[in-house]
Swiss-Prot record:
Protein's UniProt name: Putative defensin-like protein 101
Taxonomic lineage of the native organism: Eukaryota, Viridiplantae, Streptophyta, Embryophyta, Tracheophyta
Disulfide bonds: C39-C81, C43-C67, C52-C79, C56-C80
Record-stated family: Belongs to the DEFL family.
Residues that span the membrane, as ranges: none
GO terms for biological process, alphabetical: defense response to fungus; killing of cells of another organism
Compartmental location: Secreted
Keyword annotations from UniProtKB, A to Z: Antimicrobial, Disulfide bond, Fungicide, Plant defense, Secreted, Signal
Length: 84
């Protein structure tokens, strides 16, 4: 019983911070929205790091992209490609 309890506790201590990190660190408020060429769609809730950058690079935006909250676009972050 003790070993099961310890394993479950360890999983919770390790798993929840990882999920929380990936869910919250991917998007931020965009202060200068003029750098974005266009937003290509919403960022997945549990996207891997650099998901948006890779999507923009595959669409020939050489500066990449980032997940950002855009004014007037609702409460979900958008994948916006950078126009430099």
């Amino acid at each position: 019983m003790d070993i099961t309890k310890n394993i479950v506790t360890l999983l919770l201590v390790v798993l929840f911070p990882i999920l929380f990190y990936y869910n919250n660190v991917l998007a931020f408020p965009a202060s200068d929205q003029s750098i974005y060429a266009r937003c290509i769609g919403p960022c997945p809730r549990y996207a891997v790091p650099h998901w948006c950058e890779n999507e923009c690079l595959s669409r020939k935006y050489m500066a990449g992209g980032e997940c950002a909250f855009i004014e007037g676009e609702g409460p979900t972050p958008r994948c916006c490609c950078i126009n430099l």
